[in-house]
Regions:
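Positively charged n-region of N-terminal signal peptides that target proteins for export
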Residues: 1-5
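N-terminal alpha-helical modules
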Residues: 18-120
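Bacterial N-terminal signal peptides
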Residues: 6-16
Length: 120
């Protein structure tokens, strides 16, 4: 679990804080090394994480108290699921585990961001 926290921190810190809107998704498979793939996935995940947080904040500010509480609880459970699910992929053998964990974080984060954006 500690390694997933480190991965999440790397993903968050690797994004440019100046990116207001995400660029079109890069094809991370075009990278030349595992490290470049992992960095690409981290960059893309950070972009989607920013979108997710903006959508969450927008929803929280517009919902009545009862629905805010439900969204807060759902989001906390979603974070637990994401962390546990991606920790499974991170626990694999070799450097491919880093790629699989990065793909997991990108896939789940982008899906959740789109889900919340659709509700705003």
């Amino acid at each position: 679990m500690k390694s997933l926290t480190v991965i999440a921190l790397v993903l968050i810190l690797s994004a440019s804080p100046l990116a207001a809107e995400p660029a079109p998704e890069e094809n991370c498979n075009d990278a030349n090394s595992t490290a470049e793939i992992v960095q690409c996935l981290a960059t893309q995940t950070a972009i989607w994480d920013r979108r997710l947080n903006l959508a969450y904040q927008k929803l929280m500010s517009s919902l009545p108290a009862r629905r805010r509480e439900r969204l807060r609880n759902a989001q906390r459970l979603w974070v637990q699921f994401r962390d546990a699910n991606c920790a499974y992929f991170a626990s694999g053998e070799g450097s491919i585990a880093r790629v699989e964990a990065g793909q997991c974080l990108l896939r789940l984060t982008s899906a959740r961001a789109q889900e919340l954006e659709a509700d705003t």
